[in-house]
Amino acid sequence: MEKYIMALDQGTTSSRCILFNQRGEVCSVAQKEFTQVYPRTGWVEHRPMDIWSSQISVAAEAMAAIGAKAEDIDSIGITNQRETTIVWDKNTGEPVYNAIVWQCHRTADMIEQLKKDGFDSVIRKKTGLIPDAYFSATKIKWILDNVDGVRERAEAGSLLFGTVDTWIIWNLTKGRVHVTDYTNASRTMLFDIHNLCWDDEILTYFKIPKSMLPKVQASSSIFGHTEEGLLGGEILISGAAGDQQAALFGQCCFEPGEVKNTYGTGCFLLMNTGDTAIESQNGLLTTIAAGDAGHIEYALEGSVFVAGAAIQWLRDEQRMIKKASQSEEYAKEVEDTNGVYVVPAFTGLGAPYWNPYARGTIVGITRGFSKEHMIRATLESLAYQTVNVLHAMEQDSNISLKSLRVDGGASANNFLMQFQADVLNTLVYRPQCIETTALGAAYLAGLATGYFKDRNEIKDNWTLGGTFSPQMDEQKRKELLKGWKRAVRCALAWAEDIE
């Protein structure tokens, strides 16, 4: 039997396992959802044992589906929801509290205080991040400050912190290994991305004991072995990366200026910037990209809060479509939006505007406005928001975009991808294998063991599924983008206190 790479893909709503062969083809998939916990409005938690039990069960299931044994698995690569925070007892393995999920904003007041203290510039300079409750630092502090006896136990050295990758590796190795990779460390708001170390000044500010923190190493390197009894024998763990960085690697965006966009609930855009950590002047995050061969690479990251969620809104709240795929059919029934723009700022606007108080708007409505126009305008809004982030990336990097690689659920929408190419005036490439996040984790693991020879071999595996070339004339493109800017101004104006 040929050997496989096992990718453990631990997401926000489910745990998945995919077995890949040397050609980067999917050989087996297993998936299991787990319970979301909402203790209060705006709070989001996961039970750490649910994360672990679902992940190990799908690993066994994926192996069993094709009759694979431990000796048939070359190595394991892990990719995970980023920033989600777990604290546990290093002697018993028992979590002291539920995992606080990246979406949870219970610590927003800590961020406001941080800004009042003038500490936001320190965070920005050292971590590359714009201070936000999204990241791990304030979540750790909340657990230390609000769970009885936890701060004392942490200061005594008996507690450990980890992002989800760390928690999975710790359990796979039965507590022998407490480690993370550079990409996940770079999302904690505690890690100096320039000197590649946990930052003492930031730890002191948040009153977080350094003894809690994991060792940090390259995304493609040897992390340890699984405990023999878990999957029928020892398996090497040799890759780990946060989900968006794993997708950048899975899309083979290895050169500075190469960009991928994942069209999920929101959009996550990452641009490889090589060995240069660019400090954004346009509201983007500077982060560490997944690397191999012992060298560090950086990326610029921009987020669009609402993308696929806008299509869900058409389906669930507006009841204009019965399934997401119908949005393409309706959009193609009209030649344009009849001058209408939808700005889906349901939870504010992300990069490059960063206004949490902006609200969704529909502008330019006339009597001739139809359901089809509404659906088309909503789809087009995903492309316009992507243009805004990519233009910010071009300005920060001084690199002109040559093409965009796409993945995620909404990338299957051919109308959207063509419109994206048109308003961006750039080629859009969609790969045949859209499992780019798990594939990135598999590639990182396989490079560390020699299963994959080098990046060139991986590039050869990348197979084009579809190309979308710009077909819009320059004048029309400029007019549409000008209209979008006016529509965004309306969404931003809603946040202003106007008498």
UniProtKB/Swiss-Prot annotation:
Annotated EC: 2.7.1.30
Gene3D superfamilies given in the database record: 3.30.420.40
Activity regulation behaviour: Activated by phosphorylation and inhibited by fructose 1,6-bisphosphate (FBP).
Pathway(s) it belongs to: Polyol metabolism; glycerol degradation via glycerol kinase pathway; sn-glycerol 3-phosphate from glycerol: step 1/1
Record bears the keyword Transferase: yes
Chain sites annotated for binding ADP: 12, 16, 265, 308, 409, 413
Class of enzymatic activity (EC top level): transferase
UniProt-annotated binding residues for glycerol: 82-83, 134, 243-244
Keyword flag Kinase: yes
One MF annotation (Gene Ontology) recorded for this entry: glycerol kinase activity
InterPro entries per the UniProt record, alphabetical: ATPase_NBD, Carb_kinase_FGGY, Carb_kinase_FGGY_CS, FGGY_C, FGGY_N, Glycerol_kin
Binding-site list for sn-glycerol 3-phosphate: 12, 82-83, 134, 243
Binding residue positions for ATP: 12-14, 265, 308, 312, 409
Keywords: ATP-binding, Glycerol metabolism, Kinase, Nucleotide-binding, Transferase
Catalytic activity: glycerol + ATP = sn-glycerol 3-phosphate + ADP + H(+)
UniProt xrefs under PANTHER family: GLYCEROL KINASE (PTHR10196:SF69), SUGAR KINASE (PTHR10196)
Assembly and interaction partners: Homotetramer and homodimer (in equilibrium).
Family (UniProt): Belongs to the FGGY kinase family.
Function field: Key enzyme in the regulation of glycerol uptake and metabolism. Catalyzes the phosphorylation of glycerol to yield sn-glycerol 3-phosphate.
Name of this protein: Glycerol kinase
Natural source organism: Lachnoclostridium phytofermentans (strain ATCC 700394 / DSM 18823 / ISDg) (Clostridium phytofermentans)
Gene assigned in the entry: glpK
